[in-house]
From Swiss-Prot:
Pfam family name, one: HMG_box
Highest classification ranks of the organism: Eukaryota, Metazoa, Chordata, Craniata, Vertebrata
Organism, as annotated: Xenopus laevis
UniProt-annotated stretches for the region PQA: 63-103
Subcellular location: Nucleus; Cytoplasm
Record keyword Iron present: no
Protein name from the UniProt record: Transcription factor Sox-9-A
Record region (Dimerization (DIM)): 63-103
Length: 477
């Protein structure tokens, strides 16, 4: 900065002159110790040291100022300052306001500033290496410890300065600069609170941000320490703390509806980021059968061929069977997309999906095995259909609960149709039961499209295409 150049020259001349002892303190005073509220600028005086004190300060202080430095140093300072063109120094200008061409008029110092300036000057002389911020903190602590009697001279001096300032600048009006940065920080924190439920601070700020919508006054909600505002808030505030949302997450999924249905709710949970692994098997085993149809809006529409063609014909039989997941200890048997994929094969494959589905529901809804459920396909294969449904009830219900995890880890055999054809009797029902394994096994299952050799299987022994149910992964949309 240009202002420091004269002081650098000044210190050089002091070294030439005589005593180097006062020079560090003087250069520290003039350059190092910022006195923010000193009245007046360096342009008005040839000695900048005097300007850190108020104009009409005690004469005693000015005398001590003059006595502080030897005559040689004072002459060197005045010589340097004379040789410098002070009109070249840019004046500090406040951008907002019409006073761009006028020099900035500082506020009159209050009592604490009078004390801090005088004490800072004294301490900076004695301890030139004190950090200015630490010095300010210490001065503030000391000021709070002073009693009224000790503060009185500073209060009187501040009052005198205020009166003098009013005389000098009768039309002075204090116009503080608006702190845009702080407000931006607050709004950023509020935005962050609406997107990620991180800190209670951010949650309370978000509650404050939503307070115009609530009927009660949220003015009490200033800090997370005051919980009075929490009880007075809206009955279902859009941003709830994370501790509330985690038990709530399975509930929202249990109802099968997105979070965004609650009116003006900000998008807290992006379903693309939600792993179904969060729903543990215990949670899903407690879920009653519900319509998985609403989940299909989160599944990729074009992910598998033939999904949309017969979607309507299977909606009645979707569901999660809680009995198999309870007996096997494995994850739920999700049926949502298995049936939708089979129409891409020929028409008998739909029979198998109905068959496997009906045997899957034997413990839960036996009314779904009635012929009325299969009305869509009954025109084509009505004799076989009734045969299969009764066959499922008597054939699979005995062996169904005894399945263990080891029985369906069969992914290494997926390619060979010979394995399936000789095991066609009972295993067909066992394997088609678990169309959706628990989350840890999800990546193992790939679509089985190998239909070779299947028509040779006898119809009465097992349904055609029994390896046809495609084991799908519920991928994120």
């Amino acid at each position: 900065m240009n202002l420091l150049d004269p002081f650098m020259k000044m210190t050089e001349e002091q070294d030439k002159c005589m005593s180097g002892a006062p020079s560090p303190t003087m250069s520290d005073d003039s350059a190092g110790s910022p006195c923010p509220s000193g009245s007046g600028s360096d342009t008005e005086n040839t000695r900048p040291q005097e300007n850190t004190f108020p104009k009409g300060d005690q004469e005693l202080k000015k005398e001590t100022e003059d006595e502080k430095f030897p005559v040689c140093i004072r002459e060197a300072v005045s010589q340097v300052l004379k040789g410098y063109d002070w009109t070249l120094v840019p004046m500090p200008v406040r951008v907002n306001g019409s006073s761009k061409n006028k020099p900035h008029v500082k506020r009159p110092m209050n009592a604490f500033m009078v004390w801090a300036q005088a004490a800072r000057r004294k301490l900076a002389d004695q301890y030139p290496h004190l950090h200015n911020a630490e010095l300010s903190k210490t001065l503030g602590k000391l000021w709070r410890l002073l009693n009224e009697g000790e503060k009185r001279p500073f209060v009187e001096e501040a009052e005198r300065l205020r009166v003098q300032h009013k005389k000098d600048h009768p039309d002075y009006k204090y116009q503080p600069r608006r702190r845009k940065s702080v407000k931006n920080g607050q709004t950023e924190q509020e935005d962050g609170a609406e997107q990620t439920h991180i800190s209670p601070n951010a949650i309370f700020k978000a509650l404050q941000a939503d307070s115009p919508h609530s009927s009660s006054s949220m003015s009490e909600v200033h800090s997370p320490g005051e919980h009075s505002g929490q009880s007075q808030g809206p009955p279902t505030p859009p941003t709830t703390p994370k501790t509330d949302i985690q038990p709530g997450k399975p509930d929202l999924k249990r109802e099968g509806r997105p979070l965004q249905e609650n009116g003006r709710q900000p998008p807290h949970i992006d379903f693309r980021d939600v792993d179904i692994g969060e729903l543990s098997s215990e949670v899903i085993s407690t879920i009653e059968t519900f319509d998985v149809n609403e989940f299909d809006q989160y599944l990729p529409p074009n992910g598998h061929p033939g999904v949309g063609s017969t979607q309507a014909s299977y909606t009645g039989s979707y569901g999660i069977s809680s009995t198999p997941s309870a007996t096997t200890g494995a994850g739920p048997a999700w049926m949502s997309k298995q049936q939708q994929q089979q129409p891409q094969q020929h028409s008998l494959s739909t029979l198998n999906s109905e068959q496997s589905q009906s045997q899957q529901r034997t413990h839960i809804k036996t009314e779904q095995l009635s012929p009325s459920h299969y009305s869509d396909q009954q025109q084509q294969h009505s004799p076989q259909q009734l045969n299969y449904s009764s066959f499922n009830l008597q054939h699979y219900s005995s062996s169904y609960p005894t399945i263990t995890r080891a029985q369906y880890d069969y992914t290494e055999h997926q390619g060979s149709s010979t394995y399936y054809s000789h095991a066609s009797g009972q295993n067909s029902g066992l394997y088609s039961t678990f169309s959706y394994m628990n989350p840890s096994q999800r990546p193992l299952y790939t679509p089985i499209a190998d239909t070779t050799g299947v028509p040779s299987i006898p119809q009465t022994h097992s349904p055609q295409h029994w390896e046809q149910p495609v084991y799908t992964q519920l991928t994120r949309p």
